Amino acid sequence: MKSTLSYLLIICSLFTACIGHQEESLLFYVDTRTGTAPSATHTAELFGKNTEEYGQTLPAVLEPNGMNFWTPQTQDTEAKCKAPYYYKDTKIQGFRNSHWIVGGCTQDYGSMTLMPVSGTLKYLPQDRGSLFSHQEETATPAYYSVLLKDYSIFAEMTGRSRSAIFRFTYNQPEDAYLIVNPNSDEGKGYIEIDTIKKQIRGYNPVHRIYQGWGEPAGYNGYFIIEYQNEIEEYGTFRHDSLFAGQRQIADGTGIGAYLRFKIHSEGPILIKAASSFTDMEGAQKNLDTEIPHWDFDRTRQELNSIWEQRLSQVTVQTNNRNDKEKFYGALYRASFLPRTFNDVDGRYPSFSTGHPFRQSANGRNYYEDYSMWDTYRALHPLVNILTPKKAGDMMQSLVDKYEQGGWLPIFPCWNSYTAAMIGDHCISALGDAYIKGIRNFDINKACEGMLRNAFRTPATYEEYKNGMGRRALNSYLKYGYIPLEDSVPEAFHTCEQVSRTLEYAYDDFVLAQVLQKLETSDDYFPDPQKTGLYDTLMIRARYYRNVINPSTGYAQGRYADGSFLTDAGNAFSFTRFITEGAPCHYTWYAPHDIYGLMECMGGKKKYIAKLDSMFSEHRYWHGNEPCHQIAYLFNYAGQPWKTQREVRHIMETEYLNAPGGLSGNDDAGQMSAWYVFSAMGFYPVCPGTPYYIIGSPSFPRMSIRLENGKTFTILAHNANKKNIYIQSAKLNGKEYDKNYFTHQDIVQGGTLEFQMGPNPNTNWGASALSLPPDNMK
């Protein structure tokens, strides 16, 4: 036993040494465990509580936007707000093919867990968990390994989009077991052992949350596991009952299966696994296509290459390893979602119902799990820059959902409608893609769905209750805002009337921009207000003004008679008419009309004073999305040096290279996408327009490798921790004084060059001609 344990430790040591010889690989700048511990940043301590105190990320092995996230498991539940892995936990219970919506407070679904154990058979997750050390854990995007101390088993995993291969080196080969669970918290599911084909097969039914909580989603998470070795013993179990020699079991709490392998010498055994949302045949085809062999190292190298290509889309030059690790860690986390949902043959379950199965056309993928209230802000704009073809496929998937379900979804997750969060931001994602030149999706059908959401409510109460259509649209259209009397009872989170008004106004603006670019005729869709569609939507784009209290300059609850709440002090307190924040956070949410917002606040001077106070009085909360554009809003007032200062401060204090290094939920990659953009020196304050607002580039040189073969390079001479202020700029060799630039500047390739210094240059980017355009003119 001692000799075998020494052998395992040597394996760990050799792999660690290998890392040292591959420093040039970008994968080794990524520690996938960042965000798995309680947030330790400044604003997390001020505002974070309950589920917001974690980044809710995973140390997952995956392909970018792949189907499965292969992760160690320390939590044995698919429950809402419980990630499969937390850094603080001391025992690993297995390795899961997770479909967790990474970085959020949602649920896992359709998952399966397998665990190698040795010695006495322990099959329940809470019993079989093994102590482990983070010092004996290796976590990269393409490979994970850990020493399971209780069993002296060295466990390794790598994989592809829908499949994985495991290498387990057992210390006690005469008592080498494999445990498999379909992870149903609902007590449903099925598992069977096929000793002829050397397979374990099963499924875990998917259930909805939010609208239709607990209802079947109409499809299952199927899985297949293959092994090579002969077995000496097998059986099934249900909670605390063991059924030796039984080949199958269905339904019940804690069901699973086990094998005892017939191996009598030291050395690794290999296990392969794959999944599908269609059927068992789909899982088999996924495995046979993606990993048709038993070569662990080959699969690992394939996944290494995929990640190397992904991460090298943006190359940075710096002597600061810490910042380089933060950047590539953020790019990794911005590569999880939306997930591939179809099998290798293109089949996937119908949106909303599960049946019949659909077929993706022309070799494209169908995507699912859009945490759209979060990701329209920066993650989807980042995809539009780095992988526009994939972006178009993601947008076509939204169109497919509209065609299959009858309504454009609000927050599509689990291949189902939900009204979990507010707004109608599939409109923003679709509009941003189209405005930025992405054409490989059906914009006409998309427009049909967007207009339906903007002007109609479901014909039946059942549809509305099921999550279709905008919440409280009738009130919004009647009053020009959602009054406090409308409690929005059929939303998962009721009330939030002011935030809904603000976000609908923005979505209406984006839809207007799409119609204008399409030059859509007014008979494209019946307009109940009898004016041009574009004009109607642009009027509605100003509805945000209806919830800005002119006496305070802050967003505030308003009654149907037009009166505002009288308590001015509540601008700084969390309240039910605001989504996950206070009025002082949401007041800044008019990304499409910052100059109009400035007017609502009483002019530029008061606007600047309020903006200053957000930071000087510690009201800014980076841990939640409504604040993400705020630091960039100084540019609109001609004070871009303040944007440069605050953005750099956020990057330094709200992003750490540590397990607790995120300031709140990563929310499907939005938090990380903010960092990627900000490190590059710009941010999409208003998706649906072609403009990027300039911040403070943090690396001396960055190059964005574009799909069209061109390169956009950002040079920041003298950039470091002290030299955070822009002194001057050039675009393609010409002096540049604007504090923004366009998407076209990126896609045509070129060089944006900055001279950086330790003191603000209050003249650069400050003149009236330097400010971002007024979108409302």
What are these regions (language model features)?
Residues M1-E23:
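Bacterial Sec-dependent N-terminal signal peptides
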